[in-house]
């Protein structure tokens, strides 16, 4: 029955039935922490002592017999019985027994618990004993105690006295007790004297002899012996407390005489006193034990005797053991058995024990009890006995010979015939019978025992010339290698030649001989080479067999190893060290196996030495890629050293690699190592104080603000730690989900197999089990891989082939056990595992009955490994049955969908969704999938299903469900887009609109019933034609949203926050599910644990900024400030930090839970997990944590007032952002009344918002008058004031004061640009020097101004400025290299010379970023430009000249390749010189990776110019593909890509998700070049062609009909367009089968398409025909190619283009059922709005492009470039972004425009 169902059933019964009875019954079905806690809670509230005792007895019984219960009880709240339930004597006894077994749970009792304990005697005593808390903290009244309580009290008091010696207050209390207290006083007071008669036997250990009047030294003999072993007041031997001192040393002989004859005293003395551990004492004790067996403690003393091999004591032990063997009585056997665990096991001792046990086993075979005891001993100590196997088998076989001889002699004496075969005579196949007694003794199967030990048996039989063994040729051949091994080990190698084996025979048995020899430590390669040739070559040639044999010996006969297995592996590595592929692919699985399996028997140092040795054979890049599987065994220091990490990003890459390792190490181990590395990087270990948690918080927060790349990487780490469920996730939990993957990638069970053939299934299985291998089941994995490879006919990938090659010849074996058929597959009470098991058995048997035997052979091992493996097999089998027409699987699905509300295991429902995806959605009904998706809250699956259903029928209720799903995944653009679909929004549409606006009060009113015509209330939902299933009831779903977002909850929490203003400790009572409020609770926790209040407030301010200065959070922080201020006012005599120390101390006393130290104690950041918490980065004028972080400032707050001031300013900005002018003015007025003049700046910004520029200037002037020039606020105000004045004088005056403001220089430069270009150029340069954020706009302007200068004086001045700029900021120039390079063609010689110097410096310092881009000028058609480049190249250093020469040679070869006319090409045959050029010290274009080689394959594309795709192999081992193009000018494409990179940088500053898909373009000349190849791209035409062809429709044929007219025209348009019904959306379903990846890909497509539409409109990009727009099948991204038709050139074509961008019916169709509404329109508007805000940057970066003399528009007329720039400006003048987007969309989709487009543009698809 379903576990959750049972648990809920028992929890319900607990409410009405006797809890102990219900619990007893529940334990027979399940063990649940929830039930245990519920029972404990009831027991705490109940007063019935009998029922409590009954419950505790049940606990004790289950603790003994149920391991799971032990673990669950440990984690439960059972300690509440101690702290909240009064105990009696019986319950005390049983609960004490529970604590003895389970251990105490670490808690610090609060005041109320302390008070409870003081009033309940038994609880108090148990707490003291269980928690070892023996501090004197309560003066109990002992006079009222009964006898039992008094004895308990005395025991407790003695423990308290021991822990509180010399405590005067305790001594005074003891004196008041109504009992004999002399012993207690003697313990507490060292100077207290006591009579010897009052001391008990155990009391002598707790007092000094000097305290005792009339003491006898013999009385303290044991105390003296314990004091010899005392450490920290405890005896190391017996564990007694030894508090006394000053004992007199006793004489050894006197002591021996005194204990003579007393075995117990002798054993006590031996265990405590080394002087008496003599052979004589050993003999005495052994004699005494064999005469009169003593208690177990007497035997334990034998462990202290130093028994050495061949020593006197060993001889003594052997003498007694031989005596026992000779008598062999049961008593002697018993004594020997008791001695066995405590005697040192030398080989002779172990063998003697074997003789006793084995002979006893045979002699007393009828005594089953004794036989079982002996067998248990032999089994537990098998490894020890196996260590002396040679002695054992020699003894046994000699005994067999003697026995057989005796039998034969008796037969002869009795006159038997000699011709009769003797019963002792055995053939090879009868050896099992011969060794039957021995195999039974070791509890092994006979044949297996003989087979595993033949290594010893055969050489002994051979050496003894075993008389009753008939030679068997096959037996001899199979086992003679054991004889050879034996001869090697005995050093009798010369005898091997005498046996008569040939060299080939010896060579064949080499593996069988060498592995046992290596295991026995035989490494004489010189000797072995005589028989097997070069040993290392032999190992290399037979590596798979070697590894297999080594593992087989290790698993089956681990006792054969005389040396560490790692030493043997080292020998193997030495043999194959030159072959990295073998080292990793062949060897690593076995290395990994031994790493895990050899955990206990091998020390850590041994492993480390081996790992270092093994890893030394890998190059650094290979190590970083692969050694994350070894890193968990290393410390952080070694990981850093081996990986050669140089930055935080490198560390994060390693951490991500660690967390990505699957199947190799436990996830806990990987996460622990990841945390260790994170602590090393961000925990400031350099301070010398270990890990500093507050520093960690601060470091992560600062880096988070500074770097987007850091946010992405640290977010990835956080996501993976969260997936692992590791506690370490809290370390970086502040990272928003905006920077995390919202869902893990699809599992293998979600992979779509297009054709369910055996080979297709096998390919998935092989990849799955190679990369997710469990070392614990390694052999099973290897067996499955081996068997699965038989079904794969074609080749695998190169990487896969390297890995699986070793399994193509292995011989792993597993005996298949047929599964039993089942009738019923599913019941609603089934667990997921049981469901899968029954489904697998049913479907496998159905397949077996059919004709699909090949599938059966492949899938019959599905139940051998984990659940995921079984699930994949079930999916495959179900698909086969569904395709064969089986209806039982569909019936099962229907039953599951109908039982969703009755407790179905969610994993079963999830399986149905996986099956739906696995079968491409062909068999299961959409309605069933929809119900299951909503039940599981799998909104991505629901969205995919709903859109599929809406495409069939556009029902409003389906749109309602779709709107709910989009709201649930926080895709608010689409939520609002659905509202735009309907002309008249429904109440449901309004509901979601209000929810998006966070107006939950208005949303709730949408759910209220509305009155009907007769006053009767009607439901607000619409179109209720039938009762929908509960999980699809929109009204219920909407109510759930409201329940989670109650305004009442907000109000309640805000009111609760007010309580902390009077009592800060009230923060611990705050609770909320709201992310903002959880953030605030975490802030309070930070404050409560702070050691430096001001530093903590600084961190809190940073956290608040990261959360976007949320309004509710700001209000909560106001309460926090009030709370801190009230505490400071109450303790005004103390400093802030001193007050906090007091606060921290008070909290510790008031906290129940223990605050553990270390990384796992402070969950600083986990409240930032909601994407709603994060907004776009704050504006740069913000004075706060972010600005200080970006500027590198480390100064924080110096007072609480500063924190409060920043808080008020943030509130004002928040109101201003919401246009709440009234409240904004109110807050500003409040701060002005308090003379907080910093608010004047915010007042000025408010004035600007209202259009009151004059008032804004006045406010800013006041700021400038009040604040010093050094303050940040003064600088901000001055910049803003100058910007509002916008005059040359204002900027000049401001710059005379503020000489380091990049923004001010940038603003001023624009003002001077038209009149004073030299001054403007200087200001632009200064803007970049002081703030590199200005470089995107300033650098292009600098070079444009310089190139436009005409007077020589201006040119000379500009040259000086550029020289200064180059010296200070050359590192910023590589991204603008193409813009700078184009100036080399400048007609002015002086300008060109200056540019040449800059180009030279860039080429010299940044060769990898400039050489490839320089080719266009080196091959220029303009002689002067070419000559200038030659001059630049001649000045380069020799190394750079060589590298550039190689780049040029490579480009020439690539040009030759592009010109080839052949249809098929290979490098080796057609371009052998090119293939041999590498390595040439040249980087792959656009990377830092060196080209190490080139692939042989060259792909030729069948188009007009026949471009070729080639592949470079990088030094990092990766492939880099490039397309070589001929007769194609790529210069404009290259410059267009430069612009796209600038746009991407703008997008990144505003949002983390928007981007343009770019690729590298490297022109070599005006007619050739290379383009970076992006794999997986398909053109719109190719995609549509595929789907229309399925319906028999041809795009090409349709287009050909209109070639003559070159366009369709309005008359034919509608007929043609209606024929091509949109199909593009199907491509997303087929390319991205998983619903999550499908939605992500479609969002990527929509967003990238919208962004490129705005870019294309702005740039006047035309020629967007169906083959120039491509789509990535890996991500869904849009990629545009052939970007040379720009600046409105499309309107000048023979058939002018009439649309701003392509928005045909297939394009719109693929946006989803919402069409243009939602994501597309939002992305379009926001991108256009971004362009409007950054038009200066965009136009600046187009200046060099437009004014480049190489392009045709510059050659037409000198005024053309200026007109292009003016047109670009005018495009963005006085625009309303959304209105303009509507106009553009209308133009792009207008039929009248589309019908007039050129037919080759394919406007109809």
From Swiss-Prot:
Gene3D superfamilies: Phosphatidylinositol 3-/4-kinase, catalytic domain (1.10.1070.11), Phosphatidylinositol 3-kinase Catalytic Subunit, Chain A, domain 4 (3.30.1010.10). Its EC number is 2.7.11.1. Its main location: nucleus. Residues 1660-1668 are annotated as: Catalytic loop. Disulfide bonds: none annotated. Residues 406-425 are annotated as: Disordered. Residues 1500-1506 are annotated as: G-loop. It is found in: Nucleus. Serine/threonine protein kinase which activates checkpoint signaling upon genotoxic stresses such as ionizing radiation (IR), ultraviolet light (UV), or DNA replication stalling, thereby acting as a DNA damage sensor. Recognizes the substrate consensus sequence [ST]-Q. Recruited to DNA lesions in order to initiate the DNA repair by homologous recombination. Phosphorylates histone H2A to form H2AS128ph (gamma-H2A) at sites of DNA damage, also involved in the regulation of DNA damage response mechanism. Required for cell growth and meiotic recombination. One of its GO terms (biological process) is chromatin organization. InterPro entries: DDR_Repair_Kinase, FATC_dom, Kinase-like_dom_sf, PI3/4_kinase_cat_dom, PI3/4_kinase_cat_sf, PIK_FAT. Residues 928-1420 form the FAT domain. Keywords: ATP-binding, Chromatin regulator, DNA damage, DNA repair, Kinase, Meiosis, Nucleotide-binding, Nucleus, Serine/threonine-protein kinase, Transferase. SUPFAM superfamilies: Protein kinase-like (PK-like). GO terms for molecular function: ATP binding; protein serine kinase activity; protein serine/threonine kinase activity. Belongs to the PI3/PI4-kinase family. ATM subfamily. Residues 1773-1805 form the FATC domain. Residues 1494-1793 form the PI3K/PI4K catalytic domain. CDD domains: PIKKc_ATR. One of its GO terms (cellular component) is chromosome. Residues 1680-1704 are annotated as: Activation loop. It catalyses: L-seryl-[protein] + ATP = O-phospho-L-seryl-[protein] + ADP + H(+); L-threonyl-[protein] + ATP = O-phospho-L-threonyl-[protein] + ADP + H(+). Transmembrane segments: none annotated. This is Probable serine/threonine-protein kinase MEC1 homolog.
């Amino acid at each position: 029955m379903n576990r959750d169902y049972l648990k809920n059933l028992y929890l319900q019964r607990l409410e009405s039935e006797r809890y102990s009875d219900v619990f007893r019954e529940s334990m027979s079905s399940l063990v649940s922490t929830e039930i245990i806690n519920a029972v404990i809670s009831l027991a705490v509230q109940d007063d019935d002592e009998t029922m409590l005792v009954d419950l505790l007895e049940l606990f004790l019984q289950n603790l003994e017999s149920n391991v799971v219960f032990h673990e669950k009880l440990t984690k439960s709240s059972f300690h509440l019985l101690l702290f909240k339930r009064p105990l009696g004597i019986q319950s005390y006894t049983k609960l004490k027994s529970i604590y003895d077994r389970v251990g105490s749970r670490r808690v610090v009792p609060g005041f109320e618990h302390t008070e409870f304990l003081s009033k309940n005697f038994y609880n108090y005593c148990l707490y003291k004993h269980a928690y070892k808390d023996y501090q004197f903290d309560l003066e109990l009244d002992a006079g009222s105690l009964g006898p039992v309580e008094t004895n308990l009290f005395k025991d407790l008091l003695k423990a308290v006295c021991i822990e509180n010696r010399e405590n005067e207050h305790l001594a005074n209390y003891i004196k008041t007790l109504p009992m004999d207290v002399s012993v207690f006083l003697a313990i507490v007071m060292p100077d207290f004297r006591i009579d010897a008669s009052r001391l008990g036997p155990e009391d002598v250990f707790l007092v000094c002899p000097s305290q005792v009047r009339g003491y006898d030294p013999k009385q303290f003999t044991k105390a003296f012996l314990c004091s010899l072993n005392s450490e920290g007041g405890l005896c190391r031997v017996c564990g007694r407390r030894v508090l006394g001192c000053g004992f007199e040393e006793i004489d050894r002989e006197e002591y021996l005489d005194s204990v003579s004859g007393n075995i117990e005293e002798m054993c006590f003395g031996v265990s405590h006193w080394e002087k008496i551990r003599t052979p004589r004492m050993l003999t005495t004790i052994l004699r005494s034990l064999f005469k009169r067996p003593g208690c177990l403690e007497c035997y334990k003393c034998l462990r202290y005797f130093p028994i050495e091999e061949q020593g006197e004591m060993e001889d003594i032990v052997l003498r007694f053991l031989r005596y026992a063997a000779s008598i062999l009585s049961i008593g002697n056997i018993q004594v020997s058995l008791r001695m066995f665990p405590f005697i040192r096991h030398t080989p002779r001792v172990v063998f003697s024990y074997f003789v006793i046990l084995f002979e006893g086993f045979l002699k007393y075979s009828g005594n089953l009890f004794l036989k079982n005891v002996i067998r248990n001993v032999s089994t537990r100590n098998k490894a020890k006995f196996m260590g002396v196997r040679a002695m054992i088998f020699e003894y046994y076989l000699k005994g067999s010979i003697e026995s057989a001889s005796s039998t034969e002699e008796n037969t002869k004496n009795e006159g038997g015939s000699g011709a009769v075969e003797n019963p002792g005579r055995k053939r090879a196949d009868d050896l099992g019978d011969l060794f039957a007694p021995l195999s039974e003794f070791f509890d092994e199967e006979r044949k297996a025992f003989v087979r595993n030990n033949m290594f010893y048996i055969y050489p002994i039989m051979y050496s003894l010339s075993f008389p009753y063994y008939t030679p068997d040729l096959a037996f001899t051949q199979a086992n003679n290698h054991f004889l050879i091994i034996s001869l090697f080990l005995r050093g009798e190698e010369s005898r091997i030649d005498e046996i008569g084996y040939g060299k080939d025979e010896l060579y064949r048995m080499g593996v069988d001989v060498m592995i046992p020899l290596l295991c026995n430590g035989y490494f004489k390669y010189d000797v072995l080479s005589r028989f097997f040739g070069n040993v290392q070559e032999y190992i290399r040639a037979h590596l798979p067999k070697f590894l297999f044999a080594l593992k087989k010996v290790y698993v089956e006969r681990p006792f054969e190893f005389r040396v560490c297995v790692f030493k043997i592996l080292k020998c193997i590595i030495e043999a194959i060290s030159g072959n990295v592929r073998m080292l990793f692919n062949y060897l690593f699985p076995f290395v990994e196996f031994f790493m895990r399996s050899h955990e206990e028997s091998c020390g850590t140092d041994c492993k480390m030495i081996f790992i270092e040795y093994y890893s030394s054979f890998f190059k650094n890049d290979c190590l970083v890629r692969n050694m994350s599987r070894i890193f968990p065994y290393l410390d952080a220091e070694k990981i850093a050293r081996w990986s050669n990490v140089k930055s935080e990003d490198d560390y994060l890459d390693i951490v991500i690699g660690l967390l990505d390792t699957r199947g190799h190490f436990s996830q806990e181990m990987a996460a622990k190592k990841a945390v260790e590395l994170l602590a090393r990087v961000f925990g400031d270990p350099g301070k010398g104080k270990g890990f500093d948690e507050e520093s960690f918080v601060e470091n992560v927060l600062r880096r988070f603000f500074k770097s987007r790349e850091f946010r992405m990487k640290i977010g990835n780490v956080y996501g993976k730690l969260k997936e692992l469920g590791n506690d370490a996730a809290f370390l970086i939990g502040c990272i928003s989900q905006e920077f995390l993957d919202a869902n893990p990638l699809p599992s293998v069970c979600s992979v779509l197999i297009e054709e369910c053939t055996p080979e297709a299934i096998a390919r998935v299985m092989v990849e799955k089990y190679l990369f997710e291998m469990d070392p614990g089941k390694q052999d099973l994995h290897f067996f499955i891989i081996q068997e699965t490879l038989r079904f794969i006919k074609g080749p695998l990938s190169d990487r896969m082939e390297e890995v699986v090659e070793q399994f193509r010849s292995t011989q792993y074996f597993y005996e298949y056990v047929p599964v039993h058929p089942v009738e019923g597959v599913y019941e609603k009470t089934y667990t997921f595992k049981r469901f899968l098991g029954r489904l697998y058995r049913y479907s496998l048997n159905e397949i077996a009955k059919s004709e699909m035997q090949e599938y059966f052979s492949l899938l019959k091992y599905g139940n051998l490994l984990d659940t995921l493996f079984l699930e994949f097999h079930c999916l495959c089998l179900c698909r086969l049955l569904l395709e064969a027409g089986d209806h039982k699987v569909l019936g099962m699905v229907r039953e599951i969908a109908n039982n969703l509300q009755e407790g179905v295991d969610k994993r079963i429902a999830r399986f149905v969704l996986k099956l739906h995806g696995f079968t491409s959605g062909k068999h299961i009904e959409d309605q069933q999938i929809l119900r299951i998706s909503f039940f599981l809250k799998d909104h991505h699956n629901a969205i995919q299903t709903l859109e599929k259903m809406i495409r069939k029928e556009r029902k409003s209720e389906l749109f309602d469900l779709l709107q709910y799903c989009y709201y649930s995944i926080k895709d608010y653009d689409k939520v609002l887009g659905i509202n735009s679909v309907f002309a008249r929004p429904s109440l449901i549409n309004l509901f979601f609109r209000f929810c998006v606006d966070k107006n939950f009060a208005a949303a709730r009113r949408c759910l209220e019933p509305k009155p009907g015509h007769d006053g009767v209330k009607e439901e607000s939902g619409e179109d209720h034609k039938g009762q929908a299933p509960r999980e699809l009831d929109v009204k219920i779903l909407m109510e759930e949203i409201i329940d989670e977002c109650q305004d009442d909850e907000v109000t309640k929490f805000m009111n609760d926050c007010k309580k902390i203003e009077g009592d800060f400790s009230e923060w611990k009572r705050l609770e909320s599910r709201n992310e903002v409020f959880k953030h605030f609770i975490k802030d309070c926790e930070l404050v409560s644990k702070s050691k430096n209040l001001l530093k903590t407030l600084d961190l809190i301010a940073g956290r608040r900024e990261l959360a976007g200065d949320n309004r509710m959070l700001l209000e909560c922080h106001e309460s926090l400030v009030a709370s801190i201020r009230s505490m400071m006012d109450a303790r005004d005599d103390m400093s802030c930090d001193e007050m906090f120390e007091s606060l921290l101390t008070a909290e510790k006393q008031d906290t129940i839970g223990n605050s553990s130290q270390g990384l796992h104690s402070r969950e600083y950041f986990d409240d930032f997990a909601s994407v709603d918490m994060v907004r776009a980065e704050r504006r740069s004028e913000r004075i706060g944590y972010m600005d200080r972080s970006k500027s590198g400032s480390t100064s924080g707050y110096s007072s609480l007032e500063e924190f409060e001031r920043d808080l008020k300013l943030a509130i004002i900005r928040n109101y201003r952002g919401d246009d709440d002018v009234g409240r904004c003015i109110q807050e500003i007025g409040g701060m002005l009344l308090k003379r907080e003049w910093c608010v004047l700046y915010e007042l000025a910004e408010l004035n600007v918002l209202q259009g009151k520029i004059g008032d804004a200037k006045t406010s800013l002037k006041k700021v400038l008058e009040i604040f010093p020039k050094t303050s940040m606020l003064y600088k901000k105000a001055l910049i803003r004031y100058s910007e509002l004045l916008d005059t040359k004088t204002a900027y000049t005056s401001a710059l005379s004061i503020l000489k380091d403001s990049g923004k001010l220089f940038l603003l001023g430069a624009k003002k001077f640009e038209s009149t004073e270009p030299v001054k403007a150029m200087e200001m632009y340069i200064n803007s970049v020097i002081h703030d590199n954020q200005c470089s995107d706009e300033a650098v292009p302007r600098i070079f444009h101004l310089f190139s436009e200068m005409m007077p020589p004086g201006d040119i000379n001045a500009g040259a000086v400025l550029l020289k200064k700029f180059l010296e200070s900021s050359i590192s910023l120039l590589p991204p603008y290299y193409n813009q700078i390079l184009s100036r080399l063609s400048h007609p002015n010689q002086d300008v060109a010379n200056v540019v040449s110097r800059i180009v030279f410096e860039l080429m010299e310092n940044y060769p990898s970023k400039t050489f490839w881009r320089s080719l266009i000028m080196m091959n220029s058609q303009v002689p002067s430009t070419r000559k200038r480049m030659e001059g630049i190249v001649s000045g380069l250093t020799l190394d750079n000249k060589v590298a550039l020469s190689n780049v040029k040679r490579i480009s020439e070869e690539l040009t030759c390749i592009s010109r080839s006319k052949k249809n098929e090409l290979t490098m080796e045959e057609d371009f052998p010189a090119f293939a041999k050029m590498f390595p040439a010290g040249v980087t792959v274009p656009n990377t830092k990776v060196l080209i190490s080689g080139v692939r042989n394959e060259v792909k030729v594309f069948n188009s007009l110019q026949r471009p070729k795709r080639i592949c470079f192999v990088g030094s990092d081992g990766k492939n880099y593909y490039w397309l070589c193009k001929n007769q194609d000018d790529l210069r404009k494409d290259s410059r267009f890509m430069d612009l796209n990179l600038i746009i991407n940088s703008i997008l990144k500053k505003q949002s983390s998700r928007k981007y343009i898909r770019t690729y590298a373009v490297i022109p070599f000349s005006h007619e050739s070049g290379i383009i970076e190849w992006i794999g997986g791209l398909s053109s719109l035409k190719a995609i549509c062609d595929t789907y229309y062809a399925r319906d028999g429709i041809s795009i090409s044929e349709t287009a050909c009909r209109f070639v003559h007219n070159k366009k369709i025209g309005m008359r034919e348009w509608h007929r043609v367009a209606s024929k091509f019904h949109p199909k593009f959306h199907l491509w997303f379903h087929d390319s991205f089968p998983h619903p999550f990846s499908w939605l992500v890909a479609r969002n990527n497509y929509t967003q990238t398409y919208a962004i490129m539409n705005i870019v294309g409109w702005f740039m006047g990009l035309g020629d967007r025909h169906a083959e120039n727009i491509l789509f990535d099948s890996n991500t869904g991204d849009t990629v545009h190619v052939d970007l040379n038709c720009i600046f409105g050139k499309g309107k000048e074509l023979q058939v002018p283009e009439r649309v701003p961008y392509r928005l045909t019916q297939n394009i719109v169709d693929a946006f989803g059922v919402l069409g243009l509404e939602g994501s597309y329109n939002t992305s379009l508007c926001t991108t256009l709005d971004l362009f409007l805000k950054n038009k200066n940057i965009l136009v600046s970066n187009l200046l060099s492009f437009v004014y480049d003399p190489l392009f045709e528009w510059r050659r037409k007329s000198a005024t053309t470039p200026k007109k292009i720039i003016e047109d670009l400006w005018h495009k963005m003048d006085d625009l309303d972004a959304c209105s303009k987007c509507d106009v553009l969309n209308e133009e792009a989709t207008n039929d009248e425009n589309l019908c007039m487009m050129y037919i080759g543009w394919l406007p109809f698809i």
